[in-house]
């Protein structure tokens, strides 16, 4: 379209396999940040997420045509090598994006899902693409600088993989998480039953279990992300059913992003009224609540449900219920004190 930024500013576009905006051009940064600000300002988004594309991957572009941009940088007194300059372009954009999003909305989270290997040999025995040196993504720096609220390295390999060990990479990223940001690795559900190297139906549930074990370690993962949605919707080899009936059987509150807002919402008022074979659970309104967490104990076993704050009443089966607890949950995951009912 004539209004497209690439049409209006062809001087910023580089062709290499596809069309790319040159990360070395300040106007490219300005445009991308302006678009993100506009989206966050006008739409009720929970987060801004960017994927693993920075400079092109070498399988699509072997020599990015930015020599004129780099020469202009050098003529202006710049002394960084080409690789360091490219990484600096990406680093400055990531930092600026993080600050800009929060200037527009303090509770909007910023996340990145980089290639799962920072550099080969980190940790020892890891082989594969050097994202630091080929797409100029110094993803460890973004995590350790606190320029993300959640970090989702694409750990798209199996537990048994030798050169790209899922457990080894998971543990290594936890060690790098010195700012204690949310570490939510990406899991390759798209590989279940498909080439290359098809996963079994048990692979993803096993990885989820490892992630949960890692949550107990310092800086460890507190969740995971399945890629992609199609594999979940089509329930490849029944893996989604297995998760729903097992590891994902109960709802969960997303971990609180306390560095954005550490104040818990006010406790809810709770009313529980018997109604035939059901109990009608009603909570008060709370201006800070985005969700409310409903937990109830049936014959000694807890069940739970996460309910939108716009819904004030939920009916549960009364049989065997010996306690009900509700909490308000705000937009960044802070939970209020318990409101408790006992029969």
List the model feature ranges, each with a label:
Residues 1-15, 52-77, 123-130:
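Aromatic- and acidic-residue-enriched segments that line the glycan-binding/catalytic groove
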Residues 71-125, 129-195:
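Glycoside hydrolase catalytic-domain groove-lining segments
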Residues 316-335:
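Beta-strand-rich modules
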């Amino acid at each position: 379209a004539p209004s497209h930024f690439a049409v209006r500013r062809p001087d910023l576009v580089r062709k290499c396999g596809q069309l790319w905006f040159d990360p070395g051009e300040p106007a490219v940064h300005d445009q991308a940040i302006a678009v993100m600000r506009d989206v966050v300002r006008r739409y009720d988004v929970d987060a801004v997420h960017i994927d693993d594309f920075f400079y092109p991957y070498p399988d699509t572009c072997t020599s990015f045509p930015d020599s004129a941009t780099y020469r202009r940088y050098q003529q202006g007194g710049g002394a960084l090598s080409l690789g360091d300059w490219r990484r600096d372009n990406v680093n400055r954009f990531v930092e600026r994006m993080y600050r800009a999003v929060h200037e527009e909305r303090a509770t909007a989270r910023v996340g990145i899902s980089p290639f799962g290997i920072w550099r080969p040999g980190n940790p020892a025995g890891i082989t594969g693409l050097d994202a630091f040196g080929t797409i100029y993504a110094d993803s460890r720096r973004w995590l350790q600088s606190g320029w993300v609220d959640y970090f989702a390295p694409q750990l798209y390999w199996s537990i048994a993989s030798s050169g790209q060990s899922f457990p080894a990479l998971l543990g290594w990223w936890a060690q790098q998480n010195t700012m204690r940001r949310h570490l939510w690795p990406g899991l390759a559900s798209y590989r279940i039953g498909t080439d290359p190297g098809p996963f079994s139906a048990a692979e993803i549930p096993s990885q989820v279990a490892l992630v949960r074990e890692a949550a107990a370690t310092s800086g460890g993962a507190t969740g995971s992300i399945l890629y992609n949605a199609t594999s979940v919707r089509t329930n490849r080899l029944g893996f989604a059913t297995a998760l729903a009936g097992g590891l994902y059987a109960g709802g969960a509150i997303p971990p609180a992003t306390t560095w954005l807002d550490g104040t818990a919402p006010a406790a809810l008022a709770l009313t529980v009224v018997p109604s035939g074979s059901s109990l009608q659970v009603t909570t008060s309104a709370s201006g800070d609540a985005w969700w409310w967490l409903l937990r109830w104990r049936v014959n000694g076993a807890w069940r739970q449900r996460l309910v939108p704050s716009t819904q004030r009443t939920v009916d549960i089966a009364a049989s065997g219920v010996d306690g009900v607890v509700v909490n308000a949950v705000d937009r960044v995951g802070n939970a209020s004190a318990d409101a408790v009912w006992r029969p």
